Amino acid sequence: MRPAFALCLLWQALWPGPGGGEHPTADRAGCSASGACYSLHHATMKRQAAEEACILRGGALSTVRAGAELRAVLALLRAGPGPGGGSKDLLFWVALERRRSHCTLENEPLRGFSWLSSDPGGLESDTLQWVEEPQRSCTARRCAVLQATGGVEPAGWKEMRCHLRANGYLCKYQFEVLCPAPRPGAASNLSYRAPFQLHSAALDFSPPGTEVSALCRGQLPISVTCIADEIGARWDKLSGDVLCPCPGRYLRAGKCAELPNCLDDLGGFACECATGFELGKDGRSCVTSGEGQPTLGGTGVPTRRPPATATSPVPQRTWPIRVDEKLGETPLVPEQDNSVTSIPEIPRWGSQSTMSTLQMSLQAESKATITPSGSVISKFNSTTSSATPQAFDSSSAVVFIFVSTAVVVLVILTMTVLGLVKLCFHESPSSQPRKESMGPPGLESDPEPAALGSSSAHCTNNGVKVGDCDLRDRAEGALLAESPLGSSDA
């Protein structure tokens, strides 16, 4: 176990992991409008470990060619000293080396060294000078570092063996689009968190994935993120380009300012107007912008009321009471076409109405109005009148006629059924034997009642009215009752 543990300690000492021994508080980053970003890291490590650290961050070991690239790297170095406080010179790994098959060339600016990437850059003659001339060789592989005097001012290139340790390294990242830095306005405590695992207090340009957090007035936190879409890059959840709106009217260098601080040394106006304001005629004051401002009288917007449905009640509408209206008169309601329509008085639920019927004359001119949905609405100008009789609409008339017809048909059917019942009763043969059995045995039957009975039957058979035959039968029965049975006078 002890040999293995000692071997692990030796391996960590000779081959530290990527990012080991770094100082995040001293690291810095910057981006240019071309889409290139650079980061400076303070960490003691070898050349290969520096390359791996840049790859893990999403970039590569940086080149420092002439032109904009050189200026961006110099700006990072001059932004502040490293962890040592600027007491000594610092060495930073870059992507500059000389391969085994290449020789040292004293007459060339890079002395036979070359950049690992083939990206086009500036002229090699515009590069930095060499602090020390490299050794002449055509067989050994050599690396180069960027030496910074006091950790701030770049001195130039220096040859260094690749297995030795430097004080830091430079990484480069390339993006297609970048977000311009948002103006802070009234924001404070700004913090940029770049996608290559680096925090910064300010970035002129931010790659997609950068998150900016700050505090607005009242210690309200705000956070926005740079995102890329089909159009380009923009800040998500940010309306405009100011993080926190200013309470005043002036902005200077993207921050809120007062009017006395807007004048430069020469007396010129050095501020810009905040959102909602525009520069006045004097060229120094910001006045309220007229765009989007309401008028003094206000704008009357008609309110749409939803149509009444089976599940929603009819919206109530209250009309203002006019002084010139008399009690009992019908109020007048203005329509959309500036015409006046009278509304009849409707008694409320549970109240006693003095009007037995509502008499209205339908002397109206129907006006067809086509709504946007395609339906036709008819309008009637109706007036109330007490002299004209009440009129029924078509539906009420149809119902009345139908009910009357049904009653008449029912009466006719009832009369017919009663007549048939009576007719069947008189034609029944059971009445003849009952009359013959009324006389005592041994007596002869009276011919006159028989004649009367025959005449009654004859009356029925001859089609005489049932009512007349009935009266005649009753008269004959009365005569039979007055005469005694078995009398000779009968």
Swiss-Prot record:
This is C-type lectin domain family 14 member A. Keywords: Disulfide bond, EGF-like domain, Glycoprotein, Lectin, Membrane, Signal, Transmembrane, Transmembrane helix. It is a single-pass type I membrane protein. SMART domains: CLECT. Residues 301-315 have a biased composition (Low complexity). Residues 245-287 form the EGF-like domain. GO terms for molecular function: carbohydrate binding; extracellular matrix binding; extracellular matrix protein binding. The keyword Plastid does not apply. SUPFAM superfamilies: C-type lectin-like, EGF/Laminin. Residues 22-397 are extracellular. Glycans are attached at N189, N381. The chain crosses the membrane at residues 398-418. One of its GO terms (biological process) is cell migration. Residues 1-21 form the signal peptide. The lineage of its organism: Eukaryota, Metazoa, Chordata, Craniata, Vertebrata. Residues 419-490 are cytoplasmic. Its main location: membrane. It is found in: Membrane. Coiled coil: none annotated. It comes from the Eukaryota. The keyword Disulfide bond applies. Residues 33-173 form the C-type lectin domain. The gene is CLEC14A. CDD domains: CLECT_thrombomodulin_like (cd03600). One of its GO terms (cellular component) is external side of plasma membrane. Disulfide bonds join C143-C162. Residues 286-349, 428-461 are annotated as: Disordered.
